[in-house]
Amino acid sequence: MRAIIKFKWAIAAIVLALTVVLSLFSPNLTELANQKGQAQLPADAVSERANAILKQAGEDNNSISVVFTLDNAIKKETENQLRIIIDKIKKIDGVEEVTSPLSAEKEVKDQLMSKDKKTVLMPVTITGSDKKAEKIADEIYQIVPDDLTAYITGASLINQDFAHSSEEGLKKTEVITVCLIIGLLLIVFRSVVTPFIPIVVVGFSYLISQSILGILVYNVDFPISTFTQTFLVAILFGIGTDYCILLLTRFREELANGHDKKEAALIAYRTGGKTLFISGFAVLIGFSALGFAKFAIFQSAVGVAVGVGILMIILYTLLPLFMVTLGEKLFWPSKKVLSHSDNKLWAFLGRHSVARPFLFIVITVVITLPFILTYDDQISFDSTAEISSDYKSIKALEAIKDGFGEGKAFPINVVVKGDKDLTTADTIPYLGNISKAIEKVDHVDSVMTITQPTGKKIKDLYIDNQLGSVSDGLDKTVKGIADVQSGLTDIENGLNQMAGQTGSASNGGSGGSLGDAADGLGKINQQLQLVSKQISQTGNTAQTVQQLTAISGQLGQIQTGLEQANQQLSGQQAQAGTLTESLKKLSEGVKSANEGLTKVSDGITASSDILEDMSKSPTVRDTGIFIPDQVMKDKDFKKSIDQYSFADGKGVQLSVVLDSNPYSEQAITTINQIKKAVANEVDGTPLENAQIVYGGVTSMNADLKELSTTDFSRTMVIMIIGLFIVLTILFRSMIMPIYMIASLLLTYYTSISITELIFVNGLGNAGVSWAVPFFSFVILIALGVDYSIFLLDRFKEEVHLGIEQGVVRSMSKMGSVIITAAIILAGTFAAMMPSGVNTLMQVASVIIIGLLLYGLVILPLFIPAIIATFGEGNWWPFGRKKGKE
């Protein structure tokens, strides 16, 4: 410290130069937080795997939705305006495709226009980052004429609005924090100079910290979140001010004791500096332990550890400069010696706590337990609730919700990826089965894929419809045969009549052959009657075709015979002309009947072929779907395949629309049920070895829930173990760390319970924001441990008076220090309340409630009672070094 004081100006110049250079040349941390600060899931998360598959296939284009809200049902004039808008949007750089709500296809139109025709949806496929999406949205807003109301939304735009909201909240927090600290320090020190010293010291720490973090984030992908800067401000200014108060108070006391300013500074750092180092080191360890978290947004809290490390360096280098330069002027105009007087309230509570420890432990439990028992752990993953409804992306969501339902904006994307083509007639039917399985899950509104591109199944693909068509065809066959029979009966009668005429005229020459032909037709009619009956009773198409082919041959012979008879007649009697003409017509009738039978036979053959193909298809029994070759070649069906497949058919997608808010807890429950339903459905099918993953907002939130829950528990254990080791070494005890940490856990769970009551039960929020439990736990434990260190470190000094007296004296001396520090730290977090960001307000609430609860209840009631209960056991297993405390 003497060397630091000796070279104080050189050190100050280095700190100033370093701050200026870093501020000028380091990357902007705010911009980096906007770019990289979103909740980034690990690569093995289901939603990230879905994104990776689509990205590899070039199918990872972004999508935004333009929503038009009309006062009345859409008119021709508005449709013309929309066509012009669509043409202009297509010309914007970065726009890949615009799906027109004015499509000629009714199914598409129904999907993009509400039933009352007052809400029109226009999906726009784009490329680029979230920032690029925001730029495209701004250009679209400029295109929309003033007489139309349009809002634009999408995951990228919501992310950007959240980033802007957080940025605005940070600016408010910075200003309010500085004002609060100045106000509180004016009250504490009664000086117009002193309040600005912590502001300057912590200000340098903050500027250097955010510059170093910017360099780390930019160059080595150091974890960052949109909350990093806000927490950095609150924590650095909070504990930095506390530490400054600790050192400045001791410095002034030493000045009053007659020491010169240099010696007073040395003593202040030799005594108060020890406590500062221990407390700062504990906070540093607490936040550094978060580097073991798997989730990047949780790891981002390590940035606070960087800030705390810088703060410690600045406190030991820059603050001494002000002490030895200004001396007593640092406290101008106050002349009174500043020292915390004994806290009578804490002394009173301490005496009674050690006298009746069990009673005060019970009182602590009575105060905290009711709140803990009400805790439901209601967590919200709705990022749209984080920002004001004034943002256009949120207004667009509300418009979609009102016009189409909540799930329309962000459907679940089921991605199926295999090693072989999945768009064959043998595999597509299994997609139909998956669709049916998903549709049976509660809260699923519709499923769109190859077999049902608009959410409604293509009926002609299902064998019940196809068999119905075959049945209808066989009915028509029977009717066709009946028509042929009727025609042949007429021909038979005509031939018999002609046979009589020609027989009397020519002594039976031609008459005999005509009679034979008539007899032949009679027999054919009888055969047709049997065929018709057989089709009706058995549906045996193969045998029917053989019989009809034979009958057709017989009709051909009769036709040939009639043509020969016609030639014979033409050379005979005078009336032969009339008979010849009649015979010609009858011959043509036979020909027509034969052609009719051929058509009937062809129809039966087609039906027979379909039935044969069905019998050979392995999918019919499993799925009830059969896709004939002509359907696979159909233009519209090919379009459906192209729309829902990728990677040359090796990948397919299903789009699942829910009837609930895609950000809600209900949606997460639904997607988990969908996963189970799909897994059961593909078991034992050609798709069982395919990768099946899930993308979209709901899938991301499901991953977020699983990861945040497991990683929170894991990180909590790591942090507690780290603190336990540090505190064990510090206090040479394994008992003290246990009840110190237990008291902090009790404080945390009580505080989070009260916060849940306020925001969920009181303000009607869906739940506490998902990041709140983690960040509030980390901050409250890391900062709260400071105050227990303040108290127990003083207890080590006073324990020579006896355990009970040592506790009472420690509480008397440290009560005002701890309460003042807690109020200042709570004040810096209170500065987060006007931010308007739900997560920040809820974290601030937990910290404020926790600090006040810890300072007013847990430390003065619980800790002394526990110390008195353990007695000499407080130093187990190492034992107390008597006379050296």
UniProtKB/Swiss-Prot annotation:
<comment type="similarity">
    <text>Belongs to the resistance-nodulation-cell division (RND) (TC 2.A.6) family. MmpL subfamily.</text>
</comment>
<feature type="transmembrane region" description="Helical">
    <location>
        <begin position="354"/>
        <end position="374"/>
    </location>
</feature>
<dbReference type="GO" id="GO:0005886">
    <property type="term" value="C:plasma membrane"/>
</dbReference>
<feature type="transmembrane region" description="Helical">
    <location>
        <begin position="772"/>
        <end position="792"/>
    </location>
</feature>
<feature type="transmembrane region" description="Helical">
    <location>
        <begin position="278"/>
        <end position="298"/>
    </location>
</feature>
<feature type="region of interest" description="Disordered">
    <location>
        <begin position="498"/>
        <end position="518"/>
    </location>
</feature>
<keyword id="KW-1133">Transmembrane helix</keyword>
<feature type="transmembrane region" description="Helical">
    <location>
        <begin position="740"/>
        <end position="760"/>
    </location>
</feature>
<feature type="transmembrane region" description="Helical">
    <location>
        <begin position="716"/>
        <end position="736"/>
    </location>
</feature>
<keyword id="KW-0812">Transmembrane</keyword>
<feature type="transmembrane region" description="Helical">
    <location>
        <begin position="304"/>
        <end position="324"/>
    </location>
</feature>
<feature type="transmembrane region" description="Helical">
    <location>
        <begin position="817"/>
        <end position="837"/>
    </location>
</feature>
<keyword id="KW-0472">Membrane</keyword>
<feature type="transmembrane region" description="Helical">
    <location>
        <begin position="9"/>
        <end position="29"/>
    </location>
</feature>
<feature type="transmembrane region" description="Helical">
    <location>
        <begin position="847"/>
        <end position="867"/>
    </location>
</feature>
<dbReference type="InterPro" id="IPR004869">
    <property type="entry name" value="MMPL_dom"/>
</dbReference>
<feature type="transmembrane region" description="Helical">
    <location>
        <begin position="202"/>
        <end position="222"/>
    </location>
</feature>
<keyword id="KW-1003">Cell membrane</keyword>
<dbReference type="Pfam" id="PF03176">
    <property type="entry name" value="MMPL"/>
</dbReference>
<dbReference type="InterPro" id="IPR050545">
    <property type="entry name" value="Mycobact_MmpL"/>
</dbReference>
<feature type="transmembrane region" description="Helical">
    <location>
        <begin position="227"/>
        <end position="247"/>
    </location>
</feature>
<dbReference type="InterPro" id="IPR000731">
    <property type="entry name" value="SSD"/>
</dbReference>
<protein>
    <recommendedName>
        <fullName>Putative membrane protein YdgH</fullName>
    </recommendedName>
</protein>
<feature type="transmembrane region" description="Helical">
    <location>
        <begin position="181"/>
        <end position="201"/>
    </location>
</feature>
